């Protein structure tokens, strides 16, 4: 069972429906016992970094423990950003710090938010993004991750090359929304299900 973490940030129904569409057993929950029992964790989310970290506070220990124990994890949009150490959006707020680095604002001169379809540039082999080369995915964000270690597997060009996906051991995360990205997005979720089964 895939546990989609409900921490009051974003439309969780669409990601749950996308997993069900590909035949995966997915449950939206904030119950730590269910998170512990799950085969994998998914952290979606939209909104502000600081607000998300405050809402995650009660689940932080469970979340970190499961990820550090090797449970497959997929972060989506804000769920990618909170993996990093800090964000320009919320100075002084600490992220989960599983991926060293910071989240920075899309530079001036670019329309913010970056909203709509954009193409992936695959920069490293990726289990999650197998078959996604040159595909278009749906993005909605004003900030992007800038990891300080070598975890970026895909970028997208929006006047500046931005992190589109990262992978580090059992941690997988996308800045784009696979659940809103048509068949290409469903393929990414299928790949995640295969990672869980491996």
From Swiss-Prot:
> Which EC numbers characterise this protein's activity in its record?
4.3.2.10, 3.5.1.2
| Domain Glutamine amidotransferase type-1: start-end pairs | 1-198
Q: Which NCBIfam families match?
A: IMP_synth_hisH
What catalytic activity does the UniProt entry give for this protein?
Answer: 5-[(5-phospho-1-deoxy-D-ribulos-1-ylimino)methylamino]-1-(5-phospho-beta-D-ribosyl)imidazole-4-carboxamide + L-glutamine = D-erythro-1-(imidazol-4-yl)glycerol 3-phosphate + 5-amino-1-(5-phospho-beta-D-ribosyl)imidazole-4-carboxamide + L-glutamate + H(+); L-glutamine + H2O = L-glutamate + NH4(+)
The organism named in the record is Methanothermobacter thermautotrophicus (strain ATCC 29096 / DSM 1053 / JCM 10044 / NBRC 100330 / Delta H) (Methanobacterium thermoautotrophicum)
Question: What are the GO MF terms of this UniProt record?
Answer: glutaminase activity; imidazoleglycerol-phosphate synthase activity; lyase activity
Location in the cell reads: Cytoplasm
Quick one: which gene encodes this?
hisH
Q: Where is the active site?
A: 77, 177, 179
List the SUPFAM superfamilies hit by this protein, alphabetically.
Class I glutamine amidotransferase-like
Q: Which GO terms describe its biological process?
A: L-histidine biosynthetic process
Q: Which UniProt keywords apply?
A: Amino-acid biosynthesis, Cytoplasm, Glutamine amidotransferase, Histidine biosynthesis, Hydrolase, Lyase
Summarize the subunit comment: Heterodimer of HisH and HisF.
Associated pathway = Amino-acid biosynthesis; L-histidine biosynthesis; L-histidine from 5-phospho-alpha-D-ribose 1-diphosphate: step 5/9
According to its UniProt record, where is this protein mainly located?
Answer: cytoplasm
For this protein, the record's InterPro entries field holds: Class_I_gatase-like (IPR029062), GATASE (IPR017926), Imidazole-glycPsynth_HisH (IPR010139)
Q: What is this protein called?
A: Imidazole glycerol phosphate synthase subunit HisH
Q: Which domain of life is it from?
A: Archaea
Q: What does this protein do?
A: IGPS catalyzes the conversion of PRFAR and glutamine to IGP, AICAR and glutamate. The HisH subunit catalyzes the hydrolysis of glutamine to glutamate and ammonia as part of the synthesis of IGP and AICAR. The resulting ammonia molecule is channeled to the active site of HisF.
